[in-house]
A protein has these predicted regions:
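Juxtamembrane helix-loop boundary signature in multi-pass membrane transporters
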Residues: 1-9, 100-158, 162, 168, ...
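Hydrophobic core positions of alpha-helical segments in small-molecule transporters
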Residues: 9, 36-37, 70, 97-100, ...
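Helical transmembrane-bundle signal
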Residues: 14, 42-46, 128-131, 157-160, ...
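Juxtamembrane helix-start motifs in multi-pass secondary transporters
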Residues: 33-34, 94, 179-180, 240
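Alpha-helical transmembrane segments of compact multi-pass small-molecule transporters, enriched
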Residues: 41-45, 97-111, 186-190, 224-227, ...
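Hydrophobic alpha-helical transmembrane segments in multi-pass integral membrane proteins
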Residues: 43-54, 105-120, 159-177, 220-237, ...
């Protein structure tokens, strides 16, 4: 399969993960404990990736190990700070600011990885950003903006952009399955010990959200992430990341088609069309 097909498969699984994740997050009492249970479950499911990608680690040099450790520390920080960002930021504000992550990743890939710059890539990124702004900016009128929340979310967007950049470098050496396992174990360690999580907090979260729901949620994120990593082995990060992470307009389309959410219908449809044009330009 081409990087484009893999990126589209990734975004389709991320959309389901996004919708399901929003539902489960409303029931969480302790997002730190939630993150530990969720990421541990996904890490243990990671061998499923070998069903469609049997790549094994190769050419593991000291440089690769160094880059991998840095990348996993960054993923650990992502898992740790995501809680603070969402705690202090309304969803409408968070959704807009976090989209800076793929944009920063796009430019970092061009600068650091030396990937090819084309006007079609730039136009595609601009269209995706514009679509998200059109779709979500209207919600800001009624949102309360907490400066602390904005700082945390900006930090999270920066962390994500760098983490994806390391993914593009590291996955080629480790293979998709092994690197998936590493990436989900890193937040478990960071969330478990900084600060230390208590057993009773984990038990309480499992009472609020049954274990099988964690696994279903994790399955969609795992497969989506696996497709994204595989796409990064075949295409440039500056192409893959803007498409694989353009979930918001597709989530909105699901709301229109399946949930009957018809408010601001013209704006929603227009935003979705912009994303489809962007994908065509970046194919």
């Amino acid at each position: 399969m081409s990087w484009l097909i893999l990126s589209l498969l990734a975004v389709s699984f991320f959309v389901i993960y996004d919708v399901a994740g929003r539902y489960l997050a409303t029931r969480s009492e302790n997002p730190q404990a939630f993150a530990v249970i969720y990421n541990l479950g996904v890490a243990l499911m990671s061998p499923l990736i070998f069903l469609f990608d049997q790549t094994i680690p190769s050419d593991i040099t000291p440089y690769v190990i160094f880059m991998t450790v840095l990348g996993l520390v960054i993923w650990g920080l992502n898992g740790r700070f995501e809680y603070f960002a969402k705690k202090h930021t309304e969803a409408s504000v968070f959704s807009i600011i976090i989209k800076l992550g793929p944009v920063m990743s796009f430019f970092l890939a061009l600068i650091i990885l030396g990937e090819t710059f084309t006007l079609s890539k730039l136009a595609g990124v601009i269209l995706i950003v514009t679509a998200n702004i059109i779709l979500l900016a209207g919600n800001l009128r009624h949102a309360k903006i907490d400066p602390k929340g904005v700082r945390y979310t900006l930090l999270l967007a920066l962390i994500l952009s760098v983490a994806w950049l390391f993914d593009a470098v590291n996955v080629k050496a480790w293979g998709v399955g092994v690197f998936c396992m590493f990436s989900f174990f890193a937040p478990v360690i960071m969330s478990s010990f900084f600060p230390t999580i208590k057993k009773k907090q984990l038990v309480r979260e499992l009472k609020l959200t049954p274990w099988w729901q964690f696994l279903v949620l994790g399955f969609f994120n795992l497969i989506g992430y696996g497709f994204m990593l595989k796409a990064l082995t075949l295409g440039e990060a500056s192409n893959v990341m803007p498409i694989a992470t353009s979930t918001t307009p597709f989530v909105v389309l699901i709301g229109i088609l399946l949930l009957g959410e018809r408010d601001s219908l013209a704006r929603k449809i227009f935003s979705s069309i912009l994303v489809l044009i962007a994908i065509y330009l970046m194919r």
